[in-house]
């Protein structure tokens, strides 16, 4: 938050519009005319009909390739896992949920504490690739599997080995070994707190795969496998989102020689391309709705805040893409626009006295209280109030109960009161302790707003007792807020410092004057890592009665998607070429058919 004057004297005009600092953050990188000109052909019925036909054909092949009467039952296990993994990587798994459950139920019945491999259970020739693939799939689908199974694949020196492929030689064997380590790497990302073997597997495979890319042996690795390795290293599970993964794997799998693909593989790839483009067409229409809404709004002409609604829509659509969640995506984007406007208002363009009045107006939900503020602040308040009331009305209608007071108190009031506390600290020159900062810095991430209204529009009935298991006062929601604050400050602390903002890095250095910035970053990144592990546990363990679609929203959008956006810097404040290219591939440019 930028420098804010502590108070306004009695003779000072509250309507002063002078800003304390000029923002150096980007404006709108996307022209509204371009958004409105998007006209995907994939909304035509013929594409949907072809997609539906492919789905039915794949279901038949899916089941025929997993015949329980198959003589080679161990190979059948691996085939099931490979099919499940493929449809998930390609982003078409929502069409095959019953088939996936049948496959994984079968795998789980055959799961062995020594892993999966060739031969009978009594004479098992262990296979780390199959075991890691099975472990990852089962854990992601909430089956109870222990990471201790990986201990079976360590030699006397503690190094991981692949099992049945270790005796083979040549390029084919090397590819199998790389595949094995890649599967272990992907599995090791789905770890829970205290799983030391998973942490060691993650470190071991990360080092191994980096050497593969850097070494001369990379020329011996299949092109598509090399693409998977690059993706795994650049976008580990917490930094990956559904639509970006699907687009990337469509391109990766497209590199495989057509003659080497099975009939099932060809159909899955064709469906993935069609499905991606059909969903993209839906997303473009939603983006056009938001673009028109914003262009017609009273705040469109205000210039004091960042205008990046395309990036905000991408934030959610890249993680939750299903057509039935259209209302949540539109609401999410509108809320993010409001939050950015308020963020920059509190950050740059208000004196402390003005912000106190503005916050009191929010607390009382009363526009008359801001009458004496500058025109741009009044416009901002009136638009915020109008839009908030509209979104609350949608939520009340969806839930069939009056939740207006609950939303006001637990979302907007909590968010802006935390911002006001920051403003007071900065105005008085106070640098809080690390713990004080985080106690206030978690609600001012705005996750309390983003994790409430869109949840209520997900199509699930959420009485307060259920809502409290995923929203306030749940540990799960606290972890979402904490992870958001930590990654924001760790990736953006220098820019925040230059901008006059507080960060947990600055507060840590005040508490530990003997420490360096590197020490502070290590501490914060350590906390972030622990936070993400606990979130894994909360998300993947069956501990509550929260509908799965709601847990997926909170976890994928507010946890993983934020890590994705910050993976290469701050993708919100300074939308760089990387983010722009990702938006293009996910929302604008269709997959070539």
Swiss-Prot record:
Q: Which domain of life is it from?
A: Eukaryota
**What is the cofactor note?**
Binds 3 Mg(2+) ions per subunit.
Q: In which pathway does it act?
A: Terpene metabolism; oleoresin biosynthesis
Q: Where is this region: Disordered?
A: 1-34
Primary enzyme class: lyase
Residues involved in Mg(2+) 2 binding: 343, 347
Subcellular location per the Swiss-Prot or TrEMBL entry: Cytoplasm
Per its record, what triggers expression of this gene product? Answer: Constitutive expression.
The record places the motif (DDXXD motif) at: 343-347
| InterPro entries named among the record's database cross-references | Isoprenoid_synthase_dom_sf (IPR008949), Terpene_cyclase-like_1_C (IPR034741), Terpene_cyclase_plant_C1 (IPR044814), Terpene_synth_N (IPR001906), Terpene_synth_N_sf (IPR036965), Terpene_synthase-like (IPR050148), Terpene_synthase_metal-bd (IPR005630), Terpenoid_cyclase/PrenylTrfase (IPR008930)
Q: Does Cytoplasm show up as a keyword for this record?
A: yes
User: Among the record's GO biological process terms, what is one?
Assistant: diterpenoid biosynthetic process
Listed EC numbers: 4.2.3.56
Catalytic activity, per the record? (2E,6E)-farnesyl diphosphate = gamma-humulene + diphosphate; (2E,6E)-farnesyl diphosphate = sibirene + diphosphate; (2E,6E)-farnesyl diphosphate = longifolene + diphosphate; (2E,6E)-farnesyl diphosphate = beta-himachalene + diphosphate
Q: Which cofactor does it need?
A: Mg(2+); K(+)
Q: What is its main location?
A: cytoplasm
Give the family, as the similarity comment puts it: Belongs to the terpene synthase family. Tpsd subfamily.
What the protein does? Involved in defensive oleoresin formation in conifers in response to insect attack or other injury. Involved in 52 sesquiterpene (C15) olefins biosynthesis.
The record's comment about this protein's domains reads: The Asp-Asp-Xaa-Xaa-Asp/Glu (DDXXD/E) motif is important for the catalytic activity, presumably through binding to Mg(2+).
Q: What is this protein called?
A: Gamma-humulene synthase
Organism, scientific name: Abies grandis
